[in-house]
Design a protein with these regions (language model features):
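Accessory helical-bundle/CTD segments and flexible terminal tails appended to RecA-like ATPase motors
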Residues: 1-171
Length: 171
């Protein structure tokens, strides 16, 4: 894969030059969240405001298989590839639990952000911050995407619906 990307870069393929995006969503966690857990120790977290985005052990019990799927998701470059991975998971293990669906949506968000030319996508409350990658800014004064002069806002309150709203926004 690295060799293919390097050859494509040398040929001037724009997709090969695409930078990786970092996704930081304040309403997701990459593991099981308990009542006492919080990304910031001094901040109390209402567990209903946070969704786990991970591959649960009860869904795919074998560690090696979970790692393989995490690797596939990390290497995914577009939404179609993420969809194919989701179908493979469902074929292999059955109905996807909410956490696995959230992980797939979070990965799709990363892929869509990369396609849109963002190197970072973050949420802070209802605010959605999409930072343009170097060389991708529409003008030199704005490093963040703005709609009508403001950062985009999320209207959904429930974490899973927020993920879907971000996907719709990026499409």
């Amino acid at each position: 894969r690295l060799l293919k990307q390097s050859v494509a870069r040398l040929k001037g393929d724009e997709n090969a030059i695409r930078s990786r995006a970092t996704v930081r969503l304040d309403f997701t966690t990459s593991g099981v969240l308990s009542e006492t857990d919080s990304p910031e120790p001094e901040i109390a977290v209402d567990v209903s405001d946070v969704i786990g985005a991970y591959m649960p052990e009860h869904f795919a019990a074998e560690t090696r298989l979970r790692i393989d799927f995490y690797r596939k998701l990390a290497n995914a470059i577009d939404a179609k590839e993420v969809e194919d991975i989701g179908e493979e998971l469902a074929d292999r293990f059955g109905e996807l639990p909410r956490e696995a669906k959230a992980l797939l949506l979070e990965t799709e968000i990363r892929c869509l952000a990369e396609e849109a030319g963002f190197d970072r996508l973050e949420t802070e409350g209802s605010s959605l911050q999409c930072r343009f990658a170097k060389g991708k800014k529409p003008n030199k004064d704005n490093k963040f995407l703005k709609v009508a002069g403001r950062l985009p806002k999320l209207s959904e309150k429930e974490p899973f619906l927020k993920l879907k709203e971000i996907v719709r926004f990026l499409k």
